Swiss-Prot record:
One term under GO cellular component: cytosol
Gene Ontology MF term list: ATP binding; ATP-dependent DNA damage sensor activity; damaged DNA binding; mismatched DNA binding
Domain of life assignment: Bacteria
Record field: transmembrane: none
Lineage, top ranks: Bacteria, Pseudomonadati, Pseudomonadota, Alphaproteobacteria, Hyphomicrobiales
Family designation: Belongs to the DNA mismatch repair MutS family.
One Pfam family named in its UniProt record: MutS_IV
One GO process term, biological-process aspect: mismatch repair
Protein name: DNA mismatch repair protein MutS
Family matches, as Gene3D superfamilies: 1.10.1420.10, 6.10.140.430, DNA repair protein MutS, domain I, MutS, connector domain, P-loop containing nucleotide triphosphate hydrolases
Binding site for ATP: G661, P662, N663, M664, A665, G666, K667, S668
Matching SMART domains: MUTSac, MUTSd
């Protein structure tokens, strides 16, 4: 995580008045730089100087090191050389991307007046400059700075603390590159899972929250955190700031937000306003996400299941990579959103499954629509760039092509007999954009378009008569230059003479070095004026060439000015219907996800799951979606297995399966595949099985794999225990829990005891659907007294002293782990294997299993409290009062909240 310095309020466009003390010691240009930099501490300042952005002092040293560019110097300040480096304006986005990726933020300072205007104000006048944009990780819009397949979220976190203890958090997250705006409220216990789901690129918090020791570790999990002053998170002015941003009189037209949600939402739009400096990116009204609307998945579970990234940090090999058959960037982003937040509403899931099912059944429609979508642009991001003045001609063309594609998709969808509800909604969205706009854009825009509007040449010939006239004058002058070159070659006798052009010299005459002396000698030197000598060429100008260059420049400037006016006019028309265009873009994304999941289902032989509100969990012939694809690439089959955690006829809660078997037999794969099948079902996807029935899962927990956390001073075993504690403390009846090898990181009996107690707690207290894999075979004895516990094992076969893994899960329990056979396969020396067998034989003679069976008979269940626990004294009144005081954060409380807290504390005092 990168902890950032606060972003200051940007200065006005006009440079502040010079400071007298600085004026005596620095040049006017450096004086201007220092004043602008002082207003933007904590950011690297890109200071525009002609065709370069230049950086000075510490900024230059940081940029030079990060970008690998030359560090030089320019002038002196207080007797010391001023470090300086620069990047070309035309390559600025590439350098910005590298700086942002390295955790830096950048203030972009542009020239806000023409140099000629500065000169007219006086010889010593400096060109006015102002910061036009603050580039931060969460406020990017350019394609070159963004991952096309991922959202780029800015997250605002607001906290409220109660005198009775317990935190509540308001969260608002915005992607200004797509205009998405979401809000929710959660408890402190839900915060980590919610942050992991949103996966923001940048978070903004109050100074107090930034420095909070309790939340420090949670915040450190985020890529970048920026602290802001408390006024940005002022709940009293939150609704007014939101109304101002959306230009509405009241919040009635927006979502009904809680005070905390409104506080976070207003902080987010305030930060967007500050970073865009005068621009006002259009956003969708904040959509409120109800608590519990999505499956809660904590960060450890997301990592263990490798949902979007493998444990090595790669997309390839993740579940997202395995199921992503989308053909558009927007579709890929939507699929990632759904995978991050599986639904918990069965009817909503059914609507998604209906859409996928329609395209599973109609392969021709599926492939036709996918073919159209392949050429569809990313309209949401094109609109975002145009709205903040960073768009180009290709963005306008993208909107044109998007409207044309909408017509093509509508025509094909119209051939469906009975489109499902989700597809019907898409069809309605695709009818909204104006077809007249597409027609005008088609008339106005040329076939070949530049990336940057200032390059010109993007308006079609014949669209604007005044522009055609300016271009003809410019081009006619260029023909004069061509004829001039032929005449100069004849006059000088230098057949290789050329007239060329660059941005520094303008037009110039160029000859090889061997002919240079001829042009610099009489009588030709009266016509040809020397400009530049290079290694192999010498360059000249003439008064005639200077005159024609001025005519070309004037005509070219007029042509470019007219083109830019046309661009702004077309851009304004597009932004007038931005809501309609954005709705169509969302429709494309929905269609892309539905058709891609249908293709996945057909290609990989997936089936439609049954998802309901029961506690059922029955999967027949289930497969791991990622492992199966990997095996298929190698020409190997995947062994499917069933799993049924549904409540037995006489039971109300789901079952707990205890899975035993050797290493390498496939226990972890079996655990993960069932969790992934459930997750796929609840995002609205078909699943890898022959049949699947899933009762809604509200929380998914996974404790699989082993890794330490050296940064936090945690051993592998400690990490395991922390994650297990979270499961035992948070899992409810609707949760799905998968646990692998709990207790393996400590002494045998310690580990066995922990695993034993954990099973009892899951069975008696949590009462959730659970898969528990272990090498402690003694635990199988618990099935005799835990009615909802079921023993299962992974089948193996011994053959000629070796073990063959069959990867079949069957009822029963393993009597051994075959660890020595696995060690032999791994290549341990024969002497070690022989000795290990000898030691194992002696240990097995002690019959640990008999001891475990006796314990199972003698020990009471976990749910029965011990006498010591029953007789434990409750906390004293003084302790309760002290805990309540510790929970208070005065810096975050309004006067009214502080008064309420004081009364609440007084109420806790014993009555006199």
């Amino acid at each position: 995580m990168t902890m950032q310095q606060p972003i200051p309020v940007p200065p006005p466009d006009e440079t502040p008045a010079p400071q007298a003390e600085a004026a005596a010691r620095v040049t006017p240009m450096m004086e201007q730089y220092l004043e602008i930099k002082a207003a933007h501490q904590g950011l690297l300042l890109f200071y525009r100087m002609g065709d370069f952005y230049e950086l000075f002092f510490e900024d230059a040293e940081i940029a030079s090191k990060t970008l690998g560019i030359v560090l030089t110097k320019r002038g002196k300040h207080q007797g010391a050389d001023i470090p300086m480096c620069g990047v070309p304006v035309e390559r600025a986005e590439d350098y910005l991307h590298r700086l942002i990726s390295a955790g830096h933020r950048v203030a972009v300072c542009e020239q806000t007046e023409d140099p000629a205007a500065a000169k007219a104000r006086g010889n010593k006048s400096v060109v006015r400059r102002g910061v036009v944009r603050l580039v931060t990780p969460g406020t990017l819009t350019e394609d070159t700075l963004l991952d096309a397949r991922a959202n780029n979220y800015l997250l605002a976190i607001a906290r409220a603390r109660s005198s009775t203890g317990g935190d509540r958090f308001g969260l608002a997250w915005i992607d200004i590159s797509t205009a998405e705006f979401m809000v929710t409220e959660c408890s402190g216990g839900e915060l980590a899972a919610t942050l992991a789901r949103i996966n923001p690129n940048e978070a903004i918090v109050t100074d107090a929250l930034y420095n909070d020791n309790e939340l420090g570790q949670t915040l450190r999990e985020l890529p970048a955190v920026t602290p802001l002053t408390r006024d940005v998170f002022d709940g009293a002015t939150a609704e007014k700031r939101l109304c101002d941003y959306f230009a509405v009189a009241t919040m009635d037209g927006l979502a009904q937000l809680t005070r905390l949600e409104a506080t976070a939402a207003s902080a987010a739009v305030t930060y967007v306003d500050r970073t865009q400096v005068g621009r006002h990116p259009p956003l969708s009204p904040p959509a409120r996400e109800a608590s519990g609307a999505t499956m809660a998945i904590d960060p450890a579970t997301r990592a263990n299941l490798e949902l979007t990234r493998t444990l090595a940090g790669e997309r390839r090999g993740s579940l997202l990579d395995a199921i992503d058959c989308t053909v558009t960037s927007a579709g890929s982003r939507l699929l990632a959103q759904r995978l991050a937040a599986p639904l918990t509403d069965a009817p909503a899931i059914a609507r998604r499954l209906d859409a996928v099912g329609a395209f599973v059944a109609d392969s021709a429609a599926r492939e036709d629509i996918r073919s159209i979508l392949r050429g569809a642009p990313d309209m949401s991001r094109a609109l975002a760039r145009l709205s903040v003045g960073r768009g180009g001609p290709r963005d306008l063309a993208g909107l044109r092509d998007g409207i044309i594609a909408a017509d093509q998709v509508l025509a094909r969808l119209g051939e469906l007999d009975q489109p499902p509800q989700e597809i019907a909604a898409v069809m309605a969205a695709l009818t909204r954009p104006s077809r007249e706009l597409a027609a005008e854009f088609a008339t106005a825009l040329d076939e070949q378009l530049p990336l940057i509007k200032r390059d010109g040449g993007f308006v079609r010939q014949g669209y604007e008569p005044a522009l055609d006239e300016a271009r003809n004058l410019r081009d006619a002058s260029r023909l004069v230059v061509a004829s001039m070159q032929a005449r100069y070659a004849d006059d000088t006798g230098v057949k290789g003479l050329k007239i060329r052009h660059n941005n520094v010299l303008g037009y110039f005459v160029e000859v090889t070095a061997q002919h240079g002396d001829k042009l610099m000698s009489a009588p030709l030197n009266a016509t040809f004026i020397h400009r530049q000598t290079l290694a192999g060429q010498i360059r000249f100008t003439t008064s005639e060439l200077g005159e024609i260059e001025a005519k070309i420049a004037n005509a070219g400037d007029r042509a470019l000015g007219l083109e830019l006016e046309i661009f702004e006019r077309l851009c304004a028309k597009a932004l007038e219907i931005s809501d309609d265009l954005r709705a169509a873009a969302q429709g494309f994304a929905l269609l892309d996800v539905a058709t891609s999941l249908a293709k996945l289902a057909v290609d990989e032989n997936y089936v439609r799951p049954e998802v309901d509100s029961s506690l059922g969990f029955a999967i027949e012939a289930g497969r791991h979606p990622v492992v199966e694809q990997a095996l298929k690439r190698n020409g190997e089959p995947f062994i499917a297995n069933a799993c049924d955690l549904s409540p037995a006829p006489a039971q109300k809660s789901g079952q707990l399966w205890l899975l035993t078997g050797p290493n390498m037999a496939g226990k972890s794969t079996f655990l993960r595949q069932n969790a992934l099948i459930a997750l796929l079902a609840q995002i609205g996807s078909f699943v890898p099985a022959t049949r699947a029935r899933i009762g809604i899962i509200d929380r998914l927990f996974s404790r699989v794999g082993a890794a330490d956390d050296l940064a936090r001073g945690r051993s592998t075993f400690m990490v395991e225990m922390v994650e297990t504690a979270a499961i035992l403390n948070q899992a409810g009846e609707r949760a799905l829990v998968i646990l692998d090898e709990i207790g393996r990181g400590t002494a045998t009996f310690d580990g066995l005891s922990i695993a034993w107690a954990a099973i009892e707690h899951l069975h008696e207290s949590n009462r959730c659907r659970t898969l528990f894999a272990t090498h402690y075979h003694e635990l199988t004895a618990l099935s005799a007294k835990l009615p909802r516990m079921f023993n299962a094992t992974v089948r193996v076969k011994e053959w000629q002293g070796n073990v063959v893994f069959l990867h079949e899960v069957l009822p029963g329990s393993a009597d051994r782990s075959y660890g020595i056979q696995v060690a032999k396969l791994a290549g341990l020396p024969p002497a070690v294997i022989t000795r290990a067998k000898s030691v194992l034989a002696k240990l097995e003679a002690q019959d640990r299993g008999q001891t475990a069976r006796a314990l199972a008979d003698d020990l009471p269940l976990f749910a029965v409290p011990s006498r010591a626990a029953a007789e434990a004294a409750p906390p004293s009144e003084a302790e309760l009062l002290m805990d309540a005081v510790k929970a208070l954060h005065p810096d975050e409380m309004s006067p009214r909240e502080a008064l309420d807290a004081l009364y609440a504390l007084k109420a806790k005092l014993p009555k006199q």
